[in-house]
From Swiss-Prot:
Annotated CDD domains: ADP_Glucose_PP, LbH_G1P_AT_C
The protein's name: Glucose-1-phosphate adenylyltransferase
HAMAP family attached to this UniProt entry: GlgC
Coiled coil: none
Pfam families associated with the record: Hexapep_GlmU, NTP_transferase
Enzyme Commission identifier(s): 2.7.7.27
GO molecular function, a single term: glucose-1-phosphate adenylyltransferase activity
Organism field: Streptococcus pneumoniae (strain 70585)
Reactions catalysed, as given in the entry: alpha-D-glucose 1-phosphate + ATP + H(+) = ADP-alpha-D-glucose + diphosphate
Name of the gene this protein is made from: glgC
SUPFAM superfamilies cross-referenced by the UniProt entry: Nucleotide-diphospho-sugar transferases, Trimeric LpxA-like enzymes
Pathway the protein takes part in: Glycan biosynthesis; glycogen biosynthesis
Residues annotated for alpha-D-glucose 1-phosphate binding in this entry: G164, E179, K180, S190
Quaternary data: Homotetramer.
Amino acid sequence: MKNEMLALILAGGQGTRLGKLTQSIAKPAVQFGGRYRIIDFALSNCANSGIHNVGVVTQYQPLALNNHIGNGSSWGLDGINSGVSILQPYSASEGNRWFEGTSHAIYQNIDYIDSVNPEYVLILSGDHIYKMDYDDMLQSHKDNNASLTVAVLDVPLKEASRFGIMNTDANNRIVEFEEKPAQPKSTKASMGIYIFDWQRLRNMLVAAEKSKVGMSDFGKNVIPNYLESGESVYAYEFSGYWKDVGTIESLWEANMEYISPENALDSRNRQWKIYSRNLISPPNFLGANAHVEDSLVVDGCFVDGTVKHSILSTGAQVREGAEILDSVIMSGAIIGQGAKIKRAIIGEGAIISDGVEIDGTDEVQVVGYNEVVGVATDED
């Protein structure tokens, strides 16, 4: 049976700029907003867009990500005619090969894609925070009779050199692509979201592999090749909230923006929910000394200190006299008595001992997963 569109989420990146937060897990598995992991946004967008077949391409430290996704039931992707498949590097007749880039990861999974038999493939990054209707992008792709459609976002000119930049004509047909140009001619930045006609992309990847032509990356190789070959390549303009959380600072900023009830992500929109795999936790407990304001406190938290403009993830503890300001406390982390945390991200299961002070006024501070800062007590 022919399926109209298959989504492939690229989730194998190490995310080295997130430092301690990605030493033991892949970047898409990093927690966000108290209740979610970063990949939840791409998966939820697929579910809300009516895409029922999703492949998640993993490579670096995939265990936590695999456990989180499971069979896809949290996103309604476990039906008879739908499903989530975890796609990891495997041994083939030519030997073991790690994914060498974004498009090479797709080539290595040609057999899986052929088994789904899609007309179109949607390529997504698993490490961005945003909401997007992919069905609307697909309709634009069809209306333009495009071979490739690239989602673009208008960025400030001073930031444009960080992105792949698209130069378009009056009809939004892409006439030139520059990968991170020093002197950008446009402010239309690639979001790393692509819709391809599958057979055309397949033919190109197979031919490139046979001829040993380097075609491992969409931005560096595939898009320029399409343009040089005269294929119809169009830009799809996106104007909603989108955040690349590839650095500590940007991850912290996105979490702080998310706290607001009227945040740009529109997180309380019941028509476009963000789904996640949520474990059942007991209710929150606020002790006699608890003072919480302008914060998100998720299920299972224990609070007996002061929390201001911060996020407490599932099962976090803030003990008596502790003060939390402008910070993200991930699941199971313990903030000891009298500790003071300001502008920091505290990783899952971390322990901040009694009286410890962490001040990120000049630079956001990070404590890694299960890391102990100070001298832990028997109670911890």
